[in-house]
């Protein structure tokens, strides 16, 4: 756990943040907006400020709050310092997988989902399960697709779910629209088994690259992720 956050601002490039806010304003959804992984709440501040106070839809945040010390209180203060009241936000301090099971049991639905949590392929795959609770016509955003675990999970998700179409792809921000409901879950047991099997292999690759960097003074060239 870090002692302090790296930044209180949104951890997106200027172009990514601009595109995210534009799509939120363009759609102007009235249903629940979900953020999975909030860090210090910088992106959350920006998303909430895209709405007037009187027109702001419900916001839900899923995060175990173990990224740095006193994370939840730092998030709340960051929101207040940016003129946004944290009191109306539904903070669910738990892992994404646990929160999904509860939300599914409660038959919740969402208009907008922004995923920027842990970047390991198994965690991203679990986060993408939330697409099951996204309404038809809703938007799902996935950040940091240049990270191998995120990119591989995104590739597989898109291959298996053609009813999700790309609306925008800015830098490492992938914006998808759910065009119809599906009889089958977006993420199957096979998908989760694939991700769980792949995760330790990717960790080994990272470890090996670090050893090579230490030996050679630089990282070896790494190919862009390819679908598995």
Which residue stretches match the model-derived regions?
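S-adenosylmethionine/decaboxylated-SAM
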Residues: 3-10, 17-228
